[in-house]
């Protein structure tokens, strides 16, 4: 009897979750997302062994190995790297090169094929708190550490979007503290206390924006994600539509395709053009960073620290 009751409850919970998702947020044919596990499609289209950052979702070429940024660092640290082309944001390329573990060379030909700012999505009604003091990442950082803003990130330990989101907030902290955003700054008591507060007040979730909509901000009232994801999810919301903010300085992810080892850079360029077209169709901006929706333009500087600093920030997050 207890087992039967447990089954009924489980079915009810699953059904309720499905109802909330379909009632509040229209479904999409492209889940995108940031699956950190390897996802190899069945039909390669390039004839090349491509490693693709999972933050790019289904824009990754068919047949590519879709990996989170930490898994990419690991994949390029093995004695025999199994990939001809790497498609990822420039910061991930830097993380591989500056990790101290890379076992191969990556081409210097790195043409940007698509960009997306890092944005702060907040539950409707909460945007006033951020707008009143900026909006800046310093303001957002302060609101998080005082418990007045409860953001969600994709997992910073594995995911590009997650570690970039934490880095954007950390940049706000260092700007206010007047301290350098580097390894030296990470060892200060002020930063350690700040990071502890952020981890305490935040939620790790691949569905931060969706959760704002589903639970009307009661679980997390904000999320730090790419603009492309924010526009997609909020555009499908039927109610509890959150607000997209662009704190300054604007941080962004710029996607490149680079040849690995002695692979032909022209082949990497062809892959990049294919991925770039897919990303732009999915709501990413073009290489120039211009916005078609009234958002601020993205400059040449991505507003993020170097790859080596991001590797160290990830290590601090995991401690």
Residue map of PLM features:
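Short beta-strand->loop
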Residues: 51-53, 144-162, 166-186
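Bilobed periplasmic-binding protein/Venus flytrap-like ligand-binding cleft at the lobe interface
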Residues: 134-145, 150, 155-157, 168-169, ...
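Sec/Tat-exported extracytoplasmic proteins
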Residues: 87-90, 122-124, 155, 172-177, ...
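Stable alpha-helical elements in mature extracytoplasmic
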Residues: 55-59, 72, 88-96, 136, ...
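Ligand-binding pocket segment of bilobal, Venus flytrap-like solute-binding proteins
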Residues: 174-247
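Extracellular/periplasmic juxtamembrane helices and adjacent flexible linkers that interface
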Residues: 1-34, 38-44, 262-319
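N-terminal segment of the mature folded domain
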Residues: 29-158
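Periplasmic-binding protein-like
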Residues: 108-120, 192, 237-273
């Amino acid at each position: 009897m207890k087992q039967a009751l447990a089954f009924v409850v489980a079915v009810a919970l699953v059904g309720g979750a499905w109802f909330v998702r379909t009632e509040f947020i229209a479904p999409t044919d492209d889940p995108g997302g940031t699956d950190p596990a390897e996802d190899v499609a069945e039909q390669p289209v390039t004839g090349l062994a491509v490693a693709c950052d999972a933050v790019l979702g289904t824009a990754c070429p068919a047949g590519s190995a879709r990996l989170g940024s930490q898994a990419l660092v690991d994949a390029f640290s093995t004695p025999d790297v199994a990939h001809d082309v790497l498609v990822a944001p420039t910061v991930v390329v830097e993380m591989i090169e500056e990790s101290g573990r890379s076992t191969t060379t990556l081409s210097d030909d790195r043409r940007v094929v698509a960009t997306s700012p890092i944005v702060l999505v907040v539950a409707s009604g909460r945007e006033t708190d951020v707008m009143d003091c900026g909006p800046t990442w310093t303001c957002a950082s302060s609101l998080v550490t005082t418990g007045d803003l409860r953001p969600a990130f994709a997992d910073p330990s594995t995911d590009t979007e997650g570690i970039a989101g934490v880095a954007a907030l950390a940049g706000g902290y260092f700007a206010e503290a007047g301290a350098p955003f580097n390894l030296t700054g990470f060892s200060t008591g002020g930063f350690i206390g700040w990071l502890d507060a952020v981890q305490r007040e935040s939620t790790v979730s691949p569905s931060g924006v969706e959760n704002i909509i589903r639970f009307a901000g009661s679980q997390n009232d904000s999320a730090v994600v790419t603009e492309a994801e924010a526009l997609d999810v909020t555009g499908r919301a039927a109610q509890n539509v959150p607000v997209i903010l662009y704190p300054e300085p604007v941080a962004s992810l710029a996607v490149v395709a680079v040849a690995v080892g002695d692979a032909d850079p022209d082949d990497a360029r062809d892959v990049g053009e294919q991925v770039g077209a897919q990303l732009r169709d999915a709501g990413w901006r073009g290489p120039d960073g211009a916005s078609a929706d009234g958002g601020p333009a993205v400059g040449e500087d991505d507003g993020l620290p170097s790859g080596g600093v991001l590797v160290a920030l990830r290590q601090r997050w995991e401690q």
